[in-house]
């Protein structure tokens, strides 16, 4: 008798679990119409709920398998070295005018001291180097954004912002689904 009761209780729990999944899927298809701060609050709430749902579904579908630390560390080091190599090649290939306009502020002493090993190999003194940097920064003009755009450095973030802006206009005037907002989490 208790065994039969436990099987019935298990069946009820499984049915309730399936019902909550169906409700969660339907919840993402709800249409909301919000503007400004209300839209931002809705976005935060949707991202919080959708990431919790993704996390619980991922844990049910595939439990986390511990990976050895030796496997993780070399890949991170390789990624870092690739990034550093790419950035150093990029900085070396920048036109001289763009190098001058990247920073218009006065250099801090710690930034100038980073170049001291370079100065040891050259005939320039530290004070002369500092004067050259200040002179070039004072001559700089602000033409770098167009040159950065032509190099393709800001296309991804700008494209994502433009998509979000069109979505926010749509959510404000027409309405949008929670699923479409969850894509930006």
Swiss-Prot record:
Positions of the pro-segment in this chain:
56-157
Tell me the superkingdom of the source.
Eukaryota
Q: Name one GO cellular component term.
A: extracellular region
Looking up Gene3D superfamilies in the UniProt record yields: Insulin-like
**GO terms for MF:** hormone activity
The record's subcellular location field reads: Secreted
What job does the chain carry out? Relaxin is an ovarian hormone that acts with estrogen to produce dilatation of the birth canal in many mammals. May be involved in remodeling of connective tissues during pregnancy, promoting growth of pubic ligaments and ripening of the cervix.
Q: Which family does it belong to?
A: Belongs to the insulin family.
Subunit record text: Heterodimer of a B chain and an A chain linked by two disulfide bonds.
**UniProt name for this protein:** Prorelaxin
Question: Per UniProt, what is the name of the gene that codes for the protein in this document?
Answer: RLN
